[in-house]
């Protein structure tokens, strides 16, 4: 009993320390977002008071300099549509793999698994050239590319869950007059809701925070996501408006933190459901 208590206490201490280490840079950015530029480098660890404190000035300047509101709009548009396309296409692909047992479906599943382990850096320059040749430097082209990169993990998760769905349920739906498409949308997809939620959260966080792929593909004169807007604060010769940078960073990370805190319990539920039933 004492060993269990000591082991539990040790784990609590370790995870508490790790949590503080993860929170430290976020708290530091938040504190410095209310300081004058000169004090961010001179006194980065001090609470902003008196002459240091500038209120919301850094936030306002950051929004004006980066076009952050427009970037938020494009990020929301790209993230929502990309996730919707990934959920629709990957769930249907997983259902096909589970229900049609052929060499083709086995190869298709193995390709999805292989796609999960191929580093993006190996193909990013070739991808950039192909996207430019096909005139995909717009949000619609980026959504198609996100589907390609998000398919591996999503198909893997959906397949693990759908293998557990009894075939008798689908047969009963077809006896009642449902077509295969109706069976999928009215029976299979609602049952797979935990996995849908988990995939939605994981893909949304990845797509919202992604900087490298859109910076290679998008026409930055017309379109930019939030991470790209933050990059616009870097001036010539490496000069940076640190005050505006801190304010913009806070605005950029707050939505995804709120989204994760609201949905984190669904991640655990979805992963557990897929692990137990798959």
Model-derived features: where do they sit?
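A structural signal for multi-pass alpha-helical bundles of membrane permease subunits
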Residues: 2-278
């Amino acid at each position: 009993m004492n060993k269990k208590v000591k082991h539990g206490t040790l784990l609590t201490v370790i995870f508490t320390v790790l949590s503080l280490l993860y929170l430290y840079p976020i708290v530091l950015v938040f504190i410095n977002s209310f300081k004058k530029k000169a004090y961010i480098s001179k006194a980065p660890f001090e609470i902003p008071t008196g002459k240091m404190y500038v209120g919301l000035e850094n936030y306002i300047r950051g929004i004006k300099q980066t076009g952050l509101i427009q970037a938020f709009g494009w990020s929301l548009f790209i993230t929502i549509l990309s996730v919707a396309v990934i959920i629709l296409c990957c769930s249907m692909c997983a259902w096909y793999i589970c229900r049609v047992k052929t060499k083709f479906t086995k190869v298709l599943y193995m390709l999805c698994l292989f796609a999960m382990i191929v580093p993006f850096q190996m193909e990013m320059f070739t991808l950039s050239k192909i996207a430019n040749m096909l005139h995909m430097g717009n949000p619609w082209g980026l959504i198609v590319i996100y589907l390609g990169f998000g398919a591996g993990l999503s198909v893997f998760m959906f397949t693990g869950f759908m293998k557990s769905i009894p075939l008798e349920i689908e047969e009963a739906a077809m006896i009642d007059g449902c077509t295969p498409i109706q069976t999928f949308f009215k029976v299979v997809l609602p049952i797979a809701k935990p996995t849908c939620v988990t995939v939605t959260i994981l893909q949304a966080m990845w797509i919202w925070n992604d900087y490298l792929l859109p910076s290679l593909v998008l026409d930055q004169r017309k379109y930019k996501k939030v991470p790209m807007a933050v990059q616009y604060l870097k001036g010539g010769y490496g000069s940076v408006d640190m005050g505006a940078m801190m304010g913009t960073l806070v605005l950029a990370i707050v939505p995804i933190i709120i989204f994760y805190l609201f949905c984190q319990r669904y991640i655990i539920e979805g992963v557990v459901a897929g692990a137990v039933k798959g």
